[in-house]
Amino acid sequence: MGETVIEKIIRNNVGKTVKPGDIVTVNVDRVMIHDIFIPFVAEKFEEMGFTKLWDPDKAVLIYDHLVPASQLDDTRHFHAGDAFARKYGMKNVHRSDVICHQLMTEAGYVKPGNIVFGTDSHTTTYGCVGAFSSGIGYTEMASILGTGTMWIKVPETIKVVIEGELPENVMSKDIILRLIGDLGADGATYRALEFTGSTVKNMTVASRMTMANMAIEAGAKCALFTPDEKTAEYCDIELNEFQKSLTGDEDATYMKTITYRAEDFAPVMACPSQVDKIKNVSELEGTEIDQVFIGSCTNGRLEDLRAAAEVLKGKKVADYVKLIVTPASRKIYRQAIAEGIMDTLAEAGAMITHPGCGLCCGRAGGILTDGERVVATNNRNFLGRMGTSKVEIYLASPKTAAACAIAGKIVNPEK
């Protein structure tokens, strides 16, 4: 019987064939911890009685949510992280230059076929390069740091097939939002989403990253894309035979298959305050807004900034509207400067901030107050995420967000 991609990855790790529902113990290839959870991971690690890391080179600590510190307690997290890294010999510590999920693939910490866990729900992002990656809590992370292993239940797989050519103003963000709307917030709970089809094959790794990042918003355990020549170039590797095999077999067993025609997609938004509350932008046109945020681990990459700059070139942000742009990494920031993207954004009236999570987690500048509306390119629009519980958050693609910044209201990027 054939295998799905997730079944192949787990089988390669544990050395035996697996099926959905099996509970197995895997050897972990890499872990990621960010600044919010490091104090709790450190405390739990020592509480469990561990005296050394299973492999200091396989652990990555990243400060991104709380930098630069904006609240008095933030520095406690940095001190706890630095102390833990020094005590246990962690060398892979990144203190100020990148969002965790961007770094893990950008810096080569994750390779196709790897099994990776992180203390963040959007760890599903690394499926963009064909890795099984998933978010866990700090107790589980402490255990992995001491043992290098983790138990998992093999998930069922939902196959998502997308064929055809996307309309000009549709981005991968529109695709994943539509899928989340169709599945519902719990429609893929503890299941793998396996993406395939000509549209997916033609996507950049960055576009795949956006989709893998948001898979958790439908409850998915992980999201997986077949590694190809684009993956190899992005990861700066030559794919081995196992990595080349990471595609779903024709006779594999899937929970279900969902098929889309790319030409049927249109710009969409997730409306307040649920990620699965999806509407076409055309249905929302004319809704006045106060702010636009372009950035995050979902849409803060170079192609996202390029897309926004193309829309904003030669235009101005509307009066009384704030546009905040936050690159996902220092590398992206510098590339955007070199290409003139930052000049275009600044000339349009954007406020450009340091790389990091920024407004997405409501910790940096830009939080909003009662009655305000924001169009944002991040992955969640829950109540209170970007300010008070009476802020309305609309999630959209970078192209749509940029168009809204110019209009001062929700507008279709085609206009």
Which residues fall in each region the model found?
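Fe-S-dependent hydro-lyases/dehydratases of central metabolism
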Residues: 1-415
